[in-house]
């Protein structure tokens, strides 16, 4: 699973997921999977989508992951009363805003990339769209 090696603080406040995304263009590959909705992407979801894509393209071409889970999410154990401090870090998430390109792929035909991204999108908790590199 993806998670930071070191962090300045162990736990963070919940905060809000507002604003517009950075990284809205396909930079590395030829095709990309772009978020239409907003939400949290856990390390497990990132890995599940990566596996789905890799298996479909049978390890040809190259896949770039453009998101990294850098926010810790805490949970208190089941059947524990409220109070007594904040819970332990259970998993890590990446906050995604609309327009963010999450995955990129290159070195494969467009139809293969489109189908691989469709399979990956089924693993993600919000709507996505297929994009291609803009040639100027």
From Swiss-Prot:
GO terms for biological process: translation. GO terms for molecular function: rRNA binding; structural constituent of ribosome; tRNA binding. Pfam families: Ribosomal_L16 (PF00252). GO terms for cellular component: cytosolic large ribosomal subunit. Keywords: Ribonucleoprotein, Ribosomal protein, RNA-binding, rRNA-binding, tRNA-binding. Belongs to the universal ribosomal protein uL16 family. Part of the 50S ribosomal subunit. Binds 23S rRNA and is also seen to make contacts with the A and possibly P site tRNAs. This is Large ribosomal subunit protein uL16.
